[in-house]
Amino acid sequence: MSKVLIQNGTIVNEGRSFKGDLLVDGEVISEIYEGMAPRGIYDEVVDASGCFVLPGVIDDHVHFREPGLTRKADIESESRAAAYGGVTSYFEMPNTVPQTTTLEAWQEKRKLGAQKSHVNYSFFYGATNDNVDSFAQLDVHHVPGIKLFMGSSTGNMLVDKMESLQRVFLTAKQLNLPVMTHCEDTEIINRNMAEAKAKYGEDPAVEHHPEIRSVEACYESSKLAVELAKQFGTRLHIAHVTTAKELELFDNQEENLPKENLPKENLQNTDSVNLPQITGEAVIAHLVFSDADYATKKALIKCNPAIKTHADRDALRRALNDGRIATIGTDHAPHELKDKQGGCAKAASGMPMVQFSLVSMLQLVDEGVLTIERMVELMAHQPAQLFQVSKRGFLCKGYQADIVVVRPQSPWKVTKEVIQSKCQWSPMEGHEYQWQVEQTFCNGHLIYNKGAFDADYRGEELNFRS
């Protein structure tokens, strides 16, 4: 096994930043030194002077479009984009073709991950109105949880029968699986769309998207999800929270706030970990953009739920620091550029973001929105804790060496040439970042190094609750 020394960097882990060295032995972190490592013989030395050394990002929310939608993206291309962006693990969503709502489809997707993914992978199992009985046959050590669409979105996996919703929450609780929800009220959205078409024509301008997929639509659905989780005692993670009003569901609920410094060594043992029951995710687009950006970005930033007001965006940013938001994902959802033309009715919803999530959040660190230590908690520590990912998400002795080295004050501009996603566009094109990902290590392997990429490397399947 090769020994790699990452030296002279600022290590960020568990709420602290300190100058130090980190030793990787094979796939795992073998030592962390505050200050200089002892003299020794190493197969490779990475000089991280002036850089920050972080745990690899765990993105709890991506759509890599394979199988069935590979004209937009595939596991190979999007996991490559992830590696370029410092993302070393991902949880992929079930609205592919076929949908990941049968054991056969889930197993086939796992095989695709093993064959094609450049970084560590896992796949959510999707709920439908009538597939709850199959949950019990899942390998709970390899599935992050159950994905539940409580609102119709890309792929139309809507679960809209109350009896089915209740069975999903009950069965997930019995199996100790978290439920991650897409919360929008379809009846409210359909009513708003009809009104918008009557007023603005058959394809209302994209500026009206947040009026159609409204605050009310998000809040009512999220409120129902919280009620069901409380009724059955199910662990609930609400995806892509977009509104200040939804954040009220987490206000003054001490039991729902993420608990800091959970005992990492016992993550696999649910009985010994006081996991918060109800948590929320924010995604990059809703933290970076507001409805004012529709004027210039148009349908490139059309997504479901819709990007809301500047006030909503700022409320989400504040919630990063007070516990109401527990993880930051991307909802990375590529489409061909030709499908991103038009307005609310015609343009596809979703955008690629996995390559630029870390540098986007580091920009918010520079702006004083949050500290780099808190960013690491939201993008690595807490996804690992809440989903009970084994031996990842922290820079700790004995943990898998998923590591990213980032350099501040290193300006660069997003051009079409640097975009790795198969769709070859990004809403961030033309944007200048001040931070740069220099190296990405996945299981101790240097997969990305200052523009050089090892296309032959394959990541590992994530383990949960084991």
PLM segments and residue spans:
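His/Asp/Glu-enriched, well-ordered alpha-helical/loop segment
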Residues: 203-224, 228-233, 300, 318-328, ...
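Short, acidic/polar
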Residues: 72-79, 129-138
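A glycine-rich helix N-cap at a beta->alpha junction
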Residues: 112-126
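Divalent metal-coordination and catalytic microenvironments
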Residues: 9, 27, 50, 61, ...
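Metal-associated gating/positioning segment near the N- to mid-region
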Residues: 51-116
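C-terminal cap of metal-dependent C-N hydrolases
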Residues: 9, 343, 397-463
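Histidine-rich, glycine-flanked metal-binding segment
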Residues: 1-55
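Histidine/acidic residue-rich metal-binding segments in metalloenzymes
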Residues: 133-328
